[in-house]
């Protein structure tokens, strides 16, 4: 299977890196397009992906497509690729574009809306799948395995995507701030900054693992 990325910004790029790092796919099986040519060159050099000249070029070369563009341009992108979409699976990470919106824009297509998060870069991501989608059983199984290679997958009802996405999507930023605050307090009391970060990070990591494995109330 060949995976294509239409847009390789922060989140889509994180997914791309995670999939290659996990061994789920080789870099030479990945195709990408982004309006930032320097970004594309970096992925070509560092991860060995194929650089495409347009969104249509990505579609023509791939079986699975990760739609990773900004919400304000997604409809423009869809108008460009509509004529070349055949049986390719669209996995959308675009906020605000769920099953109903894709049914309106690309009726008859195979599409799934998901909400990933940045810890996917270190294979500890959380990805939410919208329950309503148009994938076949086999396609959904493949996409689930894809994202399980970079973390955990939860299939949830459509109405839960906003709250779930806010928690798992924005949550890491709050955790980073908490780690920074813990480290700042330690530095204020005499610890070197590097050691303070290590202690704070491991403390949060260990605490999270305790909650998951013991299932005790935090």
Predicted regions and their residues:
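Hydrophobic packing within well-folded, soluble alpha/beta domains
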Residues: 3-5, 65, 91, 143
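Rossmann-like NAD(P)(H) cofactor-binding subdomain of soluble oxidoreductases
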Residues: 37, 47, 55-129, 133
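Internal alpha-helical scaffold of NAD(P)-dependent oxidoreductase catalytic cores
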Residues: 101, 105-110, 126-164, 175-213
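A structural micro-motif
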Residues: 1, 28, 49, 88-89, ...
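Aromatic-residue-lined binding/catalytic grooves and analogous aromatic/hydrophobic interfacial grooves
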Residues: 171
């Amino acid at each position: 299977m060949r995976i294509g990325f239409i847009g390789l910004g922060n989140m889509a790029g994180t997914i791309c890196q995670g999939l290659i790092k996990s061994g789920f796919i080789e870099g030479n099986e990945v195709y990408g397009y982004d309006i930032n040519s320097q970004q594309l060159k970096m992925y070509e050099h560092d991860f060995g992906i194929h650089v495409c000249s347009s969104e249509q070029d990505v579609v023509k070369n791939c079986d699975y497509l990760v739609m990773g563009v900004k919400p304000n341009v997604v409809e423009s992108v869809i108008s460009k690729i509509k004529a070349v979409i055949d049986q390719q699976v669209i996995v959308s990470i675009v906020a605000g574009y769920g099953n109903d919106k894709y049914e309106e824009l690309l009726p008859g297509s195979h599409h799934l809306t998901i909400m990933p998060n940045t810890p996917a870069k270190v294979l500890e991501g959380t990805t939410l799948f919208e329950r309503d989608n148009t994938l076949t059983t086999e396609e959904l199984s493949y996409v689930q395995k894809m994202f399980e290679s970079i973390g955990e997958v939860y299939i949830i009802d459509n109405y839960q995507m906003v709250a779930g996405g806010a928690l798992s999507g924005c949550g890491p930023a709050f955790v980073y701030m908490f780690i920074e605050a813990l480290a700042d307090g330690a530095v204020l009391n005499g610890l070197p900054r590097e050691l303070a970060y290590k202690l704070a990070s491991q403390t949060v990591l260990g605490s999270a693992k305790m909650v998951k494995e013991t299932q005790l109330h935090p």
